[in-house]
């Protein structure tokens, strides 16, 4: 039962990213020509080095104290076998993370001082190009965090494939291969089995709209919901 619940959680995480993508531009963005955060990743004696979705080379020497800037990212990190010392407020309200972590602000307006005060080993952020409702883009925190000697990685996650790529990188960092199998490859196999049931079936035209406090947005085929349809 625990295994089933975990796999359902992994699927739910990928679905929730679609909603997050409609609120923050960076989550629904492309990989900027990067074939994946795990590509170019190398294991080194001094830590684990990989290239994030914005093309930055990141080395994580230890991962005992990690901060996640989005609830969905906090969830992915825990699914990869990691624990957190800090996370955005939605990690607690929407994802109910298990880690005993501190809040570091809303995902659209993270507090750099709160993050640095936690003395993190590694910070996971979204590669957003702008904030929401006048908020601060998470990419704007890069210089402050790096000046404090804190490794920071940016991920662009919208579809399940994006989730799978990020999960693989996180599992490589934590060294938990079993977590990737349980929450990654086995979930992918379940999705493929469902897709095969729909092969040969006719499909109509669908318009998907997301309404939030800032207005209404049409979901494109590149979003998680569009990909599912």
List each language-model region with its residue ranges.
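Extracytoplasmic substrate-binding proteins
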Residues: 47, 56-57, 140-215
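Extracytoplasmic strand-loop-helix segments at the start of, or within, the mature domains
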Residues: 48-53, 58-91
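Flexible loop residues that form catalytic
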Residues: 71, 128, 211
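Acidic/His-rich segments in extracytoplasmic proteins that coordinate ligands and/or metal ions
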Residues: 85-173
């Amino acid at each position: 039962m625990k295994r089933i619940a975990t796999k359902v959680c992994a699927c739910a995480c990928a679905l929730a990213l679609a909603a997050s993508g409609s609120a923050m531009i960076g989550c629904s963005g492309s990989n900027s020509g990067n074939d994946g955060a795990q590509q170019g990743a190398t294991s080194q004696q001094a830590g684990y080095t990989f290239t994030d979705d914005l093309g930055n080379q990141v080395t994580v020497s230890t991962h005992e104290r990690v901060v996640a800037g989005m609830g969905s990212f906090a969830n992915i990190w825990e699914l990869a076998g990691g624990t957190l010392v800090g996370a955005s407020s939605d990690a607690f309200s929407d994802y109910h993370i298990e880690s005993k972590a501190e809040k570091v602000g809303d995902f659209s307006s993270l507090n750099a001082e709160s993050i640095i005060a936690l003395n993190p080993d590694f910070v996971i952020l979204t590669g957003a190009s702008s904030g929401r409702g006048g908020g601060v883009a998470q990419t704007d925190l890069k210089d402050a965090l790096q000046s404090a000697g804190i490794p920071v990685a940016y991920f662009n996650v919208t579809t399940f494939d994006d989730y799978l790529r990020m999960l693989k990188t996180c599992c490589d960092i934590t060294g938990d291969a079993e977590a990737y199998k349980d929450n990654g490859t086995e979930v992918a196999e379940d999705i493929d089995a469902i897709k095969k049931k729909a092969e040969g079936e006719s499909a109509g035209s669908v318009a998907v709209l997301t309404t939030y406090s800032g207005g209404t947005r049409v979901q494109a085929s590149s979003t998680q919901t569009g990909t599912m349809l």
